Swiss-Prot record:
Species name: Saccharomyces cerevisiae (strain ATCC 204508 / S288c) (Baker's yeast)
Name of the protein: Broad-range acid phosphatase DET1
Molecular function (Gene Ontology), one example: phosphatase activity
PANTHER family: BROAD-RANGE ACID PHOSPHATASE DET1
GO process annotations (BP): intracellular sterol transport
Top EC group: hydrolase
Amino acid sequence: MCEENVHVSEDVAGSHGSFTNARPRLIVLIRHGESESNKNKEVNGYIPNHLISLTKTGQIQARQAGIDLLRVLNVDDHNLVEDLAKKYIKDESSRRTLPLKDYTRLSREKDTNIVFYTSPYRRARETLKGILDVIDEYNELNSGVRICEDMRYDPHGKQKHAFWPRGLNNTGGVYENNEDNICEGKPGKCYLQYRVKDEPRIREQDFGNFQKINSMQDVMKKRSTYGHFFFRFPHGESAADVYDRVASFQETLFRHFHDRQERRPRDVVVLVTHGIYSRVFLMKWFRWTYEEFESFTNVPNGSVMVMELDESINRYVLRTVLPKWTDCEGDLTT
């Protein structure tokens, strides 16, 4: 086994200067569960990429990702989380997950405030739905708080569009499990309150509209020769193009962190996104070279990647071990 590098960010404040107590304890990236196109590439030829749904396996992975998220949060009752894990994870040994390294919960303060950013692609929204269902179940069992059935997050709604309830505190593209949506019960212990935002900048890399499987096989061979980061798909994007979207979104995050200095900061920020976007996000944040980016292979569906704030060094540390192409680290994908 080769020694894994520890990835530490150089600057958590971006170009907005240093600030304290305004940054989330964790930044978590979650890849969507298995989609129909992960199972059968032919669907890319007749279903728009943004409308591809999860498979039944992907729906299971979405709920398991909810368990994995709860496991890294500072919650009231970790035993309750493990009880839920027994319900949603039948065989831990059969799962393809990413290991955590040196995650010791540097802060023990309870996590009660989460913001989710989701790719608007259907498979990402459906993954988020599975995650939120698990959190809602934890909230109901732990603190007696239940969300009204007709006010739960719905990734579909009518036709192509998600359903976004519009309460007093809600605007288009934002969903909250706030007091407007609570049907019964009062917070008894730690009530995990969350906010959901649709964010087009964290969408999948554009592979070029409808994709015929035979032609895409040839394109993929060319990409392998050219290089995964700079190769641009016909009528689509390169990973370098995705990098530009990542840079824009991270600047938005830094502004949000800065603006929350006068208010309670988010305890946890979660991005429900895609495999390539997740790796490019980490590349930009930790300032990897393109060669370092290309050394990492894709993460399994439903994977949870954890960045933890280490206030002693004023930096975020990547606590998840990512899989690489090299043989000595090949076992990290299991």
